[in-house]
Amino acid sequence: MRHQRRVPQLGRPADQRKALLRALTTELIRHGRITTTKARAKAVRAEAERMITLAKDGSLAARRRALGYLYDKQLVHSLFAQAPERYGDRQGGYTRIIRSVRRRGDNAELAVIELV
């Protein structure tokens, strides 16, 4: 049963939320570290870990799933080339969330999410 298992809404409709998570995941994998709000960082962590797990698998089906999710084709190829040696011995926990200072304009909690 899915009681108490809500998806983080992030104050957006479903299509905008999915696009936001795809964009944040793409930028996290491209740059290795991004600064965003704490709620967005927690939401993007699951997606980024899922993409790295797909890259560790390395199969054609996993590559096609990653190509369907991430926005940059070249980024997918580099992720699949680097992930097995970088995260080969690690069973999950590929990201780290570090709390940061609050944003000046609206006092939102910020966090830095980075790849380990």
Swiss-Prot record:
Pfam families: Ribosomal_L17. Keywords: Ribonucleoprotein, Ribosomal protein. Disulfide bonds: none annotated. GO terms for cellular component: cytosolic large ribosomal subunit. One of its GO terms (molecular function) is structural constituent of ribosome. InterPro entries: Ribosomal_bL17, Ribosomal_bL17_CS, Ribosomal_bL17_sf. Belongs to the bacterial ribosomal protein bL17 family. This is Large ribosomal subunit protein bL17. It comes from Thermosynechococcus vestitus (strain NIES-2133 / IAM M-273 / BP-1).
